[in-house]
UniProtKB/Swiss-Prot annotation:
A molecular function (GO) term: 2-C-methyl-D-erythritol 4-phosphate cytidylyltransferase activity
Physiological role: Catalyzes the formation of 4-diphosphocytidyl-2-C-methyl-D-erythritol from CTP and 2-C-methyl-D-erythritol 4-phosphate (MEP).
Enzyme kind, highest EC tier: transferase
InterPro entries, A to Z: IspD, IspD/TarI, IspD/TarI_cytidylyltransf_bact, ISPD_synthase_CS, Nucleotide-diphossugar_trans
Gene behind the chain: ispD
Source organism (scientific name): Acinetobacter baylyi (strain ATCC 33305 / BD413 / ADP1)
Enzymatic reactions: 2-C-methyl-D-erythritol 4-phosphate + CTP + H(+) = 4-CDP-2-C-methyl-D-erythritol + diphosphate
Descriptive protein name: 2-C-methyl-D-erythritol 4-phosphate cytidylyltransferase
Xref: Gene3D superfamilies: Spore Coat Polysaccharide Biosynthesis Protein SpsA, Chain A
Gene Ontology BP annotations: isopentenyl diphosphate biosynthetic process, methylerythritol 4-phosphate pathway
Top-level taxon: Bacteria
Origin organism lineage: Bacteria, Pseudomonadati, Pseudomonadota, Gammaproteobacteria, Moraxellales
């Protein structure tokens, strides 16, 4: 049975948006989160989507030289918090978790979401939060892999085809209790484990992580031409 929306309102929910990265694949000079789509920056769109949920607050982990984020007309600006980001995404997330620990309970839930995913739907956000809260678990949005996957060696030679039946493409947000996620990331970093997302840290710590099926339009803006695709998706979602 699908949980009701009121279950979310009984739990304190926070969000973290790591936004300190250089985004070198997008541009050597322009930060993708500050590119404009329909008169709003990507970051404004992202924050607006997350605020479709009833958040206690959200933390933006930004570069110490970033003078843009704090001056943006973000939705629910009174709920915005800022902390110093790190060299890597995982460092930014950990800094934000440590910041949250000073104002929130370790039992509160936190959603970690990429700054450059402005198209996540409210229905997916609700489904993810409801699932984690109902089952007291960690979870991520993900979609089944559709394309045939090839393993390649020596740059261009296919060595084998990968069975995709049990493969899912991870997205964000990813959700866990603040204390659980902070412990998992600290443990992984102490043991020099490469962390690519929150789920990988939780997995290393032995925690269960479930997938909640997301949507293919929850794209991450990585390259210049992704901006136009994101614009089209945002327009289609309004219609």
């Amino acid at each position: 049975m699908k949980p009701h929306l009121h279950q979310i309102s009984q739990i304190k929910l926070w969000a973290i948006i790591p936004a300190a990265g250089s985004g070198s694949r997008f541009s050597k000079t322009a930060l993708k989160q500050y590119q404009t789509i329909e008169n709003k920056t990507v970051l404004e769109h992202t924050v607006e989507r997350l605020n479709g949920l009833t958040l206690e607050g959200y933390v933006l982990a930004i570069n110490e030289h970033d003078h843009v984020a704090q001056n943006l007309p973000l939705t629910q600006k009174h709920k915005a918090h800022f902390c110093k980001g790190g060299l890597e995404r995982v460092d930014s997330v950990l800094n934000a978790l440590q910041y949250l620990s000073s104002i929130a309970s370790d039992e509160d839930y936190v959603l970690v979401h990429d700054a450059a995913r402005p198209c996540v739907s409210l229905s997916c956000l609700q489904a993810l939060a409801e699932y984690a809260i109902k089952y007291t678990t960690n979870a991520i949005l993900a979609i089944p892999v559709r394309d045939t996957l090839k393993q390649v060696v020596d740059r261009s030679h296919i060595s084998k085809t990968i069975d995709r039946n049990h493969l899912w493409q991870a997205q964000t947000p990813q959700i866990a209790k603040i204390g659980v996620l902070k412990h998992a990331i600290q443990l992984a970093l102490e043991n020099n484990i490469k962390i690519t997302d929150e789920a990988s840290a939780l997995e290393y710590a032995g925690a269960v992580v479930d997938v909640v099926q997301g949507r293919s339009d929850n794209i991450k803006i990585t390259y210049q031409d992704d901006l136009e695709l994101a614009r089209l998706i945002l327009l289609s979602q309004k219609s």
